């Protein structure tokens, strides 16, 4: 990887060459590599400029108009703008843009609406769920009694009848609809129907699909869920952070208190400004074109792997990601990741439904198209991407080809 020229430029501009040399190296890594981690993306120069602005200097504990510190007139307007834009984006009546991450947003939801020991029904991690949906090593699994629902062993789709059966059997206080490695449409209306049957709250975690929902390409969770949380990066293409939405003002008030003073102090107003920029970008007509291309690319790439004899979990994808089962190839997620990393192709290993492989390794890999779509790749390019990954998984050295191919697509 060539880093000499960026390094010289950086050294001339900054005194702390140790850090800025590393930043230059990371910029070059991103430029010449293929980024296929489903939860990563490339945000715009305007998003990065807002996040790197003087707003980082301002402490602003509290909420707009109700701050602990003085001098918050400007950041109040920044935060109000972020709130109004995200409400417009998702059709929400209330929003909190202060959570530092998606996990922080989920923590606030739980703290606001649950008591320790309450029963929660969420998607099993091995079947596509998320750590914060009740994993025993996460706060969500340690603090609450969690019951996991799974996908159907034959279709590998969420088994809504099992969700209903478990809900009636365990009477959860909350049902979580959302995933981190599930490639199909989530039926939020069906989840709400089940939640109403047992008197449960419905919490939708849309972190992965938020950009697709914003573009109208996946059903919106908000008309059905009592509360919705998301990250602001991934398919939304903003800075790393979290956001919480609801149409219930009482729930909103509880969550506001859970965020501040519950577990956060000063919000990161420079990040909130970057969120506002990203929300504004997602409100533009061209964002729908971008989101549609993400899905087309994911479907084309999944098809290219199927044509090469790979098994795609659930047989395809309706969103931005899919999971490859690598057990027939004699690989697991850890081995595959190492081979791809050696060729500057980045993916994430993934567990598989009903897999016996240790969860640390996973039986497959999760592949996502948001980042390569941001760089301008189209369906025709997915054949080349699949070819490079296929050959790298078989042990070939394709790094030079990856650099030449990826480097021909600009970063924002």
From Swiss-Prot:
InterPro entries, A to Z: PyrdxlP-dep_Trfase (IPR015424), PyrdxlP-dep_Trfase_major (IPR015421), PyrdxlP-dep_Trfase_small (IPR015422), Ser_HO-MeTrfase (IPR001085), Ser_HO-MeTrfase-like (IPR049943), Ser_HO-MeTrfase_PLP_BS (IPR019798), SHMT-like_dom (IPR039429)
Keyword Cell cycle tagged: no
UniProt keyword terms in alphabetical order: Amino-acid biosynthesis, Cytoplasm, One-carbon metabolism, Pyridoxal phosphate, Transferase
One Pfam family linked to the record: SHMT
GO cellular component: cytosol
Location(s), subcellular: Cytoplasm
Keyword Transferase tagged: yes
Cofactor(s), names only, from the UniProt record: pyridoxal 5'-phosphate
GO molecular function: glycine hydroxymethyltransferase activity; pyridoxal phosphate binding
CDD domains, alphabetized: SHMT
First-listed, main subcellular location of the protein, grouped into a coarse class: cytoplasm
EC number: 2.1.2.1
Subunit note: Homodimer.
Family: Belongs to the SHMT family.
Its biological purpose: Catalyzes the reversible interconversion of serine and glycine with tetrahydrofolate (THF) serving as the one-carbon carrier. This reaction serves as the major source of one-carbon groups required for the biosynthesis of purines, thymidylate, methionine, and other important biomolecules. Also exhibits THF-independent aldolase activity toward beta-hydroxyamino acids, producing glycine and aldehydes, via a retro-aldol mechanism.
Listed name of the protein: Serine hydroxymethyltransferase
Species this chain originates from: Deinococcus geothermalis (strain DSM 11300 / CIP 105573 / AG-3a)
Gene symbol of the encoding locus: glyA
């Amino acid at each position: 990887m060539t880093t000499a020229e960026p390094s010289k430029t950086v050294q001339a501009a900054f005194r702390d060459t140790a850090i800025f040399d590393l930043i230059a190296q990371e910029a070059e890594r991103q430029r010449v590599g293929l980024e296929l981690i489903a939860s990563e993306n490339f945000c715009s120069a305007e998003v990065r400029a807002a996040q790197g602005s003087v707003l980082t200097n301002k402490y602003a504990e509290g909420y707009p108009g109700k701050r602990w510190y003085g001098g918050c007139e400007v950041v109040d307007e920044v935060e109000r703008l972020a709130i109004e834009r995200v409400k417009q984006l998702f059709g929400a009546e209330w929003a909190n843009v202060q959570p530092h991450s998606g996990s922080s947003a989920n923590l606030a939801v739980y703290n606001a609406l649950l008591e320790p020991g309450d029963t929660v029904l969420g998607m099993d991690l091995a079947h596509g769920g998320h750590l914060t949906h009740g994993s025993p090593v996460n706060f969500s699994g340690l603090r609450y009694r969690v019951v996991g629902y799974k996908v159907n062993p034959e279709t590998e789709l969420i088994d809504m009848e099992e969700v209903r059966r478990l809900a009636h059997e365990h009477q959860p206080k909350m049902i979580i609809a959302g995933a981190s490695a599930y490639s199909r449409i989530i039926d939020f209306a069906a989840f709400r129907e089940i939640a109403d049957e047992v008197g449960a709250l419905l919490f939708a975690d849309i972190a992965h699909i938020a950009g697709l929902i914003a573009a109208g390409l996946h059903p919106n969770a908000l008309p059905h869920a009592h509360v919705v949380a998301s990250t602001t990066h991934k398919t939304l293409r903003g800075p790393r952070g979290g956001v919480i939405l609801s149409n219930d003002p009482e729930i909103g008030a509880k969550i506001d208190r859970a965020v501040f003073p519950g577990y956060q102090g000063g919000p990161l107003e420079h990040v909130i400004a970057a969120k506002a920029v990203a929300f504004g970008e997602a409100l533009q007509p061209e964002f729908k074109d971008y989101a549609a291309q993400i899905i087309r690319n994911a479907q084309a790439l999944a098809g290219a792997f199927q044509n090469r004899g790979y098994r795609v979990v659930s047989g395809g994808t309706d969103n931005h990601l899919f999971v490859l089962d690598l057990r027939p190839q004699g690989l697991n997620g850890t081995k595959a990741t190492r081979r791809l990393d050696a060729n500057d192709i980045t993916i994430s290993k993934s567990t598989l439904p009903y897999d016996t492989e240790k969860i640390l390794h996973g039986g497959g890999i999760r592949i996502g198209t948001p980042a390569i779509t941001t760089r301008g790749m189209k369906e025709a390019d997915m054949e080349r991407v699949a070819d490079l990954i296929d050959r790298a998984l078989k042990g070939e050295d394709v790094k030079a080809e990856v650099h030449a191919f990826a480097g021909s697509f600009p970063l924002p």
